């Protein structure tokens, strides 16, 4: 049976289906009236095929410091604590007693012998102590007009713990090319009509971007939104891992390996690349990406522990969790809202808006 194939070309300018005009002997878009030579359009189509989007593949993680195994005697005196409520596991030295779970605040913690985890390559040591974290929470609550008064006066920090969160750090050089559909508008009028002309353009961009230490957290228990909101870290202060840095703190055991983290790394690299390239397209009314091709080279994965302070506080039988970057002091969290203050605030805004509108209408009349 013959292979019947219908080949349809799309207009690079507006995306409409292109037809062959027998009188012009050219391909023509009936939507924007753009004309194309067949060879030109064929070359554009081949270019799009060569820039088909795909997810880059990464080699399996290999420890920067060797095999990823702990050195002889390095884990002596280290223990694991497992929460009987949420199943969270943290690692620390035997002299640092865990009396609560930093993830859910539960106090039922079981200590057991530490075993079975990869040795990290790097660590960023804590720069801010516990008192600094408490002060940051107080500063975070200042100026919040809709915060219940009782939350501040009755607020007690139920648990506060410095914890090293496992992160996979991705390095890569991105060779990228992109095609955009851009438009420019021109307006004019005569005695009868107002006119708008839309001109379509194909814009091409290509270049190289180096990505150094793109972080993806390796813990299911940590909220990804929180962890990314705590960025950026200053990686110039990152040092080779050593167990002395764990003294007085805990380390979350990773439960998302490097392979499972690569899709998020690819997504972050792609989004950053598209954003960087799009920012160079200027002078147009609109700009829409049509195709993107990203080829990653020099790929490398490292395993690091990054410092985070977790604070839990209860208010009206609800637990509120806050997190702070243990290096930079960046603080995030969700606060309760006083419903009475909320409606009072918007009532005042509505009243002021109505008064202004009334005054303007009176002046106009």
Q: Where do the model's predicted regions map?
A:
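Short cysteine-rich clusters marking metal-coordination/redox-active sites
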Residues: 11-14, 29-32, 83-86, 101-104
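Residues immediately within or flanking Cys/His clusters that coordinate Zn2+
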Residues: 6-8, 24-26, 76-80, 98
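Short, non-ligating residues that shape and space the ligands of small metal-coordination modules
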Residues: 18-21, 38-39, 92-93, 110-111
């Amino acid at each position: 049976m013959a292979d019947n194939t219908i080949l349809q070309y799309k207009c690079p300018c507006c995306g409409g289906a292109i037809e062959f005009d027998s009188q012009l002997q050219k391909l023509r878009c009936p939507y924007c009236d753009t004309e194309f030579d067949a060879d030109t359009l064929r070359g554009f189509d081949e270019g799009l095929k060569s820039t088909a989007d795909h997810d880059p593949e990464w080699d399996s993680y290999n420890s920067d410091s060797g095999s990823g195994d702990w050195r002889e005697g390095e884990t002596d005196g280290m223990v694991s604590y497992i929460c009987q409520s949420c199943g969270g596991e943290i690692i620390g030295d035997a002299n640092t007693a865990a009396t609560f779970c930093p993830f859910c605040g539960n106090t039922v913690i079981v200590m057991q012998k530490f075993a079975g985890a990869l040795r990290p390559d790097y660590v960023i040591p804590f720069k801010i102590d516990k008192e600094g974290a408490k002060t940051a929470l107080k500063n975070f609550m200042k100026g919040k007009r809709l915060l219940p008064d009782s939350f501040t006066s009755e607020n007690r920090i139920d648990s506060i713990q410095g914890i090293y969160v496992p992160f996979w750090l991705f390095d890569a050089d991105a060779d990228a090319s992109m095609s955009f559909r851009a438009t420019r508008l021109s307006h004019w009028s005569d005695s009868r009509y107002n006119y708008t002309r839309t001109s379509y353009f194909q814009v091409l961009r290509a270049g190289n971007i180096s990505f150094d230490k793109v972080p993806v957290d390796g813990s299911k228990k940590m909220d990804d939104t929180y962890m990314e909101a705590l960025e950026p870290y200053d990686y110039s202060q990152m040092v080779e891992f050593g167990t002395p840095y764990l003294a007085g703190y805990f380390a979350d055991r990773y439960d998302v390996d490097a392979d499972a983290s690569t899709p998020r790394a690819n997504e972050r690299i792609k989004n950053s690349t598209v954003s960087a390239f799009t920012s160079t397209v200027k002078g147009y009314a609109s700009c829409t990406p049509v195709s993107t091709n990203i080829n990653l080279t020099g790929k490398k994965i490292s395993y690091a522990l990054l410092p985070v302070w977790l604070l839990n506080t209860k208010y009206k039988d609800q637990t509120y969790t806050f997190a702070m970057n243990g290096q930079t002091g960046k603080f995030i969290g969700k606060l309760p809202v006083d419903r009475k203050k909320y409606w009072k605030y918007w009532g005042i805004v509505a009243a002021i808006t109505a008064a202004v509108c009334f005054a303007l209408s009176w002046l106009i009349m």
